[in-house]
Amino acid sequence: MSGLPIATNLYFDAHFHRHGVKLLPNEFYTTREDMVLVTVLGSCVAACLHDPIGRIGGMNHFMLPDDGADPSAAASESMRYGAYAMEVLINELIKAGGRRERFEAKVFGGAAVLAGMTTINIGDRNADFVRRYLALERIRITAEDLQGVHPRKVAFMPHTGQAMVKKLRVQAPDVAAREAALAREAVDPHGERAPRVRPRVELFGTPAPKAQAKPRIELFGMRAMQPATRKQEA
């Protein structure tokens, strides 16, 4: 695990009255501890996975769906991409004692936070990717808050699976700067859209369990705007 970009920004969260970890882009974190994992998202996506029986969970934060990268690429670079970030999170939870068949997912982000982003909507691509990846992996999404135009601050309690989300003002300076850099990266030198690559995932024969009727996602902070979208049962 030494080569993987595990989040290291530990702090005490005064709002939740517990220790926490702030995840930056390209990072992940897994734990059984009763703590809070926090990240801020624009077009990026965070997947929060939880084993309700093992009471273990984790979060990742990826910037682009997949680049079809060389497997020998550095782990810190590969974590930018959803396929690798999801694989790392799942595998690390299993190594720590989680059971894949019990995993539940809550997913956030994928906003279109830059005005005029009509030809390359990174947020839509990320949201579409994480839904397809989890469907192929037979991991149910119990709740989601994806797309739209607002950046988000997400808090996840990996011990209980509780998640909370806060919508931020559209042009949050740090998020806007990061989004501009992502937009440049998503376009090749000739100004054409980078090709989309299907995630390298495995299929499993066991049918996915149905999603819960109500997502365990709440709002926090004074500027919260709306709850996460409820997942409908098939």
Swiss-Prot record:
InterPro entries on file: CheD-like_sf, Chemorcpt_Glu_NH3ase_CheD, Cytotoxic_necrot_fac-like_cat
Protein name, entry field: Probable chemoreceptor glutamine deamidase CheD
Function noted in UniProt: Probably deamidates glutamine residues to glutamate on methyl-accepting chemotaxis receptors (MCPs), playing an important role in chemotaxis.
EC number: 3.5.1.44
Pfam families: CheD (PF03975)
GO biological process: chemotaxis
Highest taxon, organism lineage: Bacteria
GO MF: protein-glutamine glutaminase activity
The family this protein is said to belong to: Belongs to the CheD family.
Catalytic activity field: L-glutaminyl-[protein] + H2O = L-glutamyl-[protein] + NH4(+)
Organism field: Burkholderia pseudomallei (strain K96243)
Gene that this polypeptide is encoded by: cheD
SUPFAM superfamilies listed in its UniProt record: CNF1/YfiH-like putative cysteine hydrolases (SSF64438)
Keywords: Chemotaxis, Hydrolase
